[in-house]
Amino acid sequence: TAENPFTCPECGKRFSQKSNCWHTEDHTGEKPFTCMECSKSFTVKSSLLSHQRVHTGEKPYTCTQCNKQFSHSAQLRAHISTHTGVGPFPCTECSKTFSLKHKLYKHQRIHTGEKPFQCLECGKSFSVKHGLLKHQRSHTGEKPYACSECQKTFAHKTTLMVHERIHTGERPYECNDCGKRFIHSTNLNCHQKIHSGEKPFTCTECGKSFSLKNKLVRHQKIH
């Protein structure tokens, strides 16, 4: 097109300026711009200049709201959303906004159903890498989170946090009917059936119903 007359011979992507021909280095893997401090290499000079701020400490981008300074323009854009409450990257499906583009891409998988991270052990797939890493512990048996009180270990941080309530006595889940408090939300849900009279577990032998599954299992031993 007239607006983008320069074409990459490798992938057909078009550019408005011939100087953008550095894009072809994405295909060749060539990285001619090297940092003199740490020897890290880059495909374009602008990326090198941006990287060098890690070493110089230069922060040329300033927030006009609070004067906080940043090394990169993307960091400033993400920060500005803390003042406005609106991120610069909106989701076209649900209008939710994000401070960073990669967070938008991650969110969009909710709508597309894309799950690019697959477990090599069982084939289960996940939309985010963190989900895969957590899942893999079910195969490796890794339990990196240890209780500081009793040294019991857990595969997930959330499970550790729930366990710690045994030591702290914290009971964050309160029954609205009687005020009784519980460590786990599942315990509260079971308790609330006392007030509601709900008995969702039915014996297939005699039709008797129970509020809790363990009561049904105990009853079934009669038959």
UniProtKB/Swiss-Prot annotation:
Start-end of C2H2-type zinc fingers: 6-27, 33-55, 61-83, 89-111, 117-139, 145-167, 173-195, 201-223
Alphabetical keyword list: DNA-binding, Metal-binding, Nucleus, Repeat, Transcription, Transcription regulation, Zinc, Zinc-finger
Pfam family, one: zf-C2H2
Record carries keyword DNA damage: no
Molecular function terms, GO-annotated: DNA-binding transcription factor activity, RNA polymerase II-specific; RNA polymerase II cis-regulatory region sequence-specific DNA binding; zinc ion binding
Role description: May be involved in transcriptional regulation.
Protein name (record): Gastrula zinc finger protein XlCGF52.1
Organism: Xenopus laevis (African clawed frog)
Lineage of producing organism: Eukaryota, Metazoa, Chordata, Craniata, Vertebrata
